[in-house]
Amino acid sequence: MKLCLRCSILVISTLLFVVPGIVSASWQPEITVGICQGVAEAEFSGRNAPLYVYTDEQQKSPLLTIPQQEKLRVRFLHNTFELNGKTYEAKQLYIQAGEYESIYINDMPYRGYITLLKQNGMTVINHVLTEDYLYGVVPKEMPSTWPMGALRAQSIAARTFALKNRNRHNEQGFDLCNTAHCQVYEGSSAETKETTVAVDRTRGEVMFYHGAIIDAVFHTDSGGMTESAEQVWGSYVPYLRAVSELQTKTKPWTQRVSTALFVKKMEESGKKIGRMKSIHLSPLSIGKGSKDRSPSGRVQFIEVLGDKGNCVVSGSDLRRLFALPSTLFDVQRESSDIVFRGYGRGHGLGLSQWGAKAFADRGKTDREILSHYYTDITIEKIY
């Protein structure tokens, strides 16, 4: 068997430090995406072509051929694969349709081909070329109705993030997962005309800082000002600096938590305060720091006073404990509740998607948008 994507793979180190312009225009890297992990069964089909199942990438004849429109039901039983009721001994399986044909996984179409691994159950992995991968990512990360400048900026950011973070899930046997932990990916069922055009018009374009591909993290909405990396990750990153938006205090949100639940969460975190007496936090002013806020205004910590003790809780811990949209908030006690009122959604690093839309609405190009959010970067076409 000759899998059609294999000719596109280069060693990962070549992606992290690239001299633009020397890579063949026909080359592009392959991404492996974890679609399902630890499952007991899955279903596959080829709507317009047969499916071919192999036990080895170099195998010339398939182990099994599934006619088009018919289902391949794979079950993982007692550390073996059962294919349509028959057991096969194999370390892993490869499933391929005809070239340029999609494979349906549980009735959802995916480009490329599939690997099945034994790993605490069965892991389903989609092998897909970078540009095909982006066709299924960009429409899930940004609405296709948004301006082309924003869609193009998102395409470049998503491509850069994917290439920088290949092998993020190496221990699980693939590069990236299909959730917001990496990038949301739903295969070809997600594709739209507008986002495909945005990907195609930026083909191979990647962001660099001093010759190295950047970690192009992005988020939904900064609330008025993005954040610097050291305030979130604890380490300085030269291209991830706090920058202002065209608009402040966008998309306000409110979240209420009962005082009883708040105290319970504190105790579960090892902070014994007893009956709550008060909460101390400087008032929010976007773009203005204080002893308990970063220079962008995000909460670094709050002080909680109780009749049995006091404690300090970080903004990131509060966001995690109470599923807050961001750390750009005020907090007050109201009757028997603790009320968080804030702005923005996400960690605040890098590209703000709503901010990108605002810039694109005013006619800014993808490069102008990206240069605003990622300091001193260059954008190069590597294939």
Residue ranges and their predicted role:
Residues 2-383:
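Conserved, single-site charged/polar hotspot
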